[in-house]
Amino acid sequence: GPLEFYIRYVARLASQNPLTHLLWKLEKGALIYVRATAAGVFTINDTVGAHDPRLRVMVAAGTGVAPFVSMIRSEVCRNPLADLSKWVVLHGASYPAELGYRQELLALSTTNGLKYWGTVSRPDETREWIGDVGRVESFFEPDRLPDLEQRLGLESGDFTPDSAVVFVCGLTGTIAAALVRLLDRGFIPNARVIREALGVPPDVRPSLFYELYDPTPVIDVGDPSLIESLRARLQTALARR
């Protein structure tokens, strides 16, 4: 299929792996090498499997929406009439213009049942915006989760690993905030080092997967007080299920 880059130039490096900046310096017609087979396991098949019946909640910050667009396009490419009612995209950016693929995703919400909500963190600078406001991880704040559950057709308190699996792509702050807030609902991260720090048995299946832009740790597992607090929150959530 076609190769498509979704990049954004920024004045200050936000990652120690600045691929965007390297691409930005290339002139038109420059050659780059791309392997025939994509690497990585941030896919539906390599996480929960194509037949998992739960909601697939995809949380993206900025250009982090790119892998989710690829997943959704693949589904529609295989079947233009694919039912996307179990697919959910939560996309955050500073300004509406930075919500890439918004029109395409909104169109799929009409034709295929995709659930899509964009949110902007600087609404005061964009008066025409009438959608959700705040960072994308704010959808998981305790006072906002009931609204998200209602939009998803769930009863209050039912947004748990029994009903949904969560995928997050973005910078460390977004992933960390989403992960920590969803511990209170019993979501288990896929990262082995975090699972071990939280005392999650190896046979417990993960329900939150993430793709990180940079090598900054999502959770400081070397902070005893933090880990003790997070472990207690997770155990409380699991005890309620």
Q: At which residue positions do the language-model features occur?
A:
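Structural motif
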Residues: 55-57, 88, 165
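FAD-binding FR-type
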Residues: 1-57, 121-122, 204-219, 234
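Reductase modules of NAD(P)H-dependent flavoproteins
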Residues: 90, 95-241
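Histidine-anchored nucleotide/phosphate-binding helix
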Residues: 67-80
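C-terminal region/appendage detector
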Residues: 21, 32, 76-78, 84, ...
